[in-house]
């Protein structure tokens, strides 16, 4: 299976400071038709002694000529549980 190229995203924080993120993975939940993306800050190198902080968002692709993506906060415990399960599966596959 060919590995698809991951995208980079610039996301501002609550103070307006922009941060650059690499896409770790994305997935869509069939039952809700909601899509989620897990991102890692650029420059965060993973090693055996230190865990990398990851960020998860619900996202929607805009139907415009630029195919922009809008990010939304994850709001429910059920969503977080599902994202955590997907992250664990992703981590196991990477080992």
UniProtKB/Swiss-Prot annotation:
It comes from the Bacteria. Coiled coil: none annotated. Pfam families: DUF1292. Transmembrane segments: none annotated. Belongs to the UPF0473 family. HAMAP family: UPF0473. This is UPF0473 protein ABC1595. It comes from Shouchella clausii (strain KSM-K16) (Alkalihalobacillus clausii). The lineage of its organism: Bacteria, Bacillati, Bacillota, Bacilli, Bacillales.
